[in-house]
């Protein structure tokens, strides 16, 4: 009986610790040391809030760069953040990826099938990725330039400026925030 009571006490202590104290410590750390004090990085255009830089969103128009596909609810639904949990040998998953490749190639007819970046046709684990690799941005430059009536080199320069380097030059990889990139294009248009 003593062992059972000890087990219950330890379980309760750990439940309180991990469900209250630990979360509180993480929240306080984010408030002190986190980017934007642990809050969303709100992005505005012409004084209007258009999104959060740290949560992906869907762009489907030809004049915008597109992010990764999302399996989070009805597309980039932060309340349903999750991957599809389908493995690479799942026939349903393979069919989804093939359909995404076909769709991507329809909008990028200048690409060969082998040149489609894998991240542009596969969803991330969270389903909320706001960033793509520079390669994924560069393969879209021609489409975006044509849709906007801009010079390809001009759009490429916007992408070049949008590339974020790894933290301290060693942590992570180069990335491009899709929302910030599209905002930069809109601001360029408004000049």
Swiss-Prot record:
NCBIfam families: kdpC, PRK00315.1, PRK14002.1. Keywords: ATP-binding, Cell inner membrane, Cell membrane, Ion transport, Membrane, Nucleotide-binding, Potassium, Potassium transport, Transmembrane, Transmembrane helix, Transport. Signal peptide: none annotated. The chain crosses the membrane at residues 10-30. The keyword Ion transport applies. It holds the Pfam family KdpC. Belongs to the KdpC family. Part of the high-affinity ATP-driven potassium transport (or Kdp) system, which catalyzes the hydrolysis of ATP coupled with the electrogenic transport of potassium into the cytoplasm. This subunit acts as a catalytic chaperone that increases the ATP-binding affinity of the ATP-hydrolyzing subunit KdpB by the formation of a transient KdpB/KdpC/ATP ternary complex. The system is composed of three essential subunits: KdpA, KdpB and KdpC. It is found in: Cell inner membrane. GO terms for cellular component: plasma membrane. The lineage of its organism: Bacteria, Pseudomonadati, Bacteroidota, Bacteroidia, Bacteroidales. It is a single-pass membrane protein. This is Potassium-transporting ATPase KdpC subunit. InterPro entries: KdpC. The keyword Membrane applies. The gene is kdpC. HAMAP family: KdpC (MF_00276). One of its GO terms (molecular function) is ATP binding. It comes from Bacteroides fragilis (strain ATCC 25285 / DSM 2151 / CCUG 4856 / JCM 11019 / LMG 10263 / NCTC 9343 / Onslow / VPI 2553 / EN-2).
């Amino acid at each position: 009986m003593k062992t059972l009571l000890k087990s219950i006490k330890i379980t309760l202590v750990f439940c309180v610790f991990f469900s209250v104290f630990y979360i509180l410590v993480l929240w306080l750390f984010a408030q002190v040391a986190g980017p934007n004090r642990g809050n969303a990085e709100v992005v505005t255009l012409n004084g209007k809030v258009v999104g959060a830089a740290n949560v992906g969103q869907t762009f489907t128009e030809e004049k915008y760069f597109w992010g990764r596909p999302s399996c989070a609810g009805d597309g980039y639904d932060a309340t349903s953040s999750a991957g599809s949990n389908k493995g690479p040998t799942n026939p349903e998953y393979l069919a989804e990826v093939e359909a995404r490749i076909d769709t991507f190639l329809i909008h990028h007819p200048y690409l060969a099938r082998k040149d489609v970046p894998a991240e542009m046709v596969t969803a991330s684990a969270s389903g909320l990725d706001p960033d793509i690799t520079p390669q994924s941005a560069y393969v879209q430059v021609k489409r975006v330039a044509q849709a906007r009536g801009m010079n390809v080199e001009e759009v490429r320069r916007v992408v070049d400026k949008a590339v974020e380097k790894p933290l301290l030059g060693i942590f992570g990889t180069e990335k491009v925030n899709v929302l910030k990139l599209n905002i930069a294009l809109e601001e360029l248009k408004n000049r």
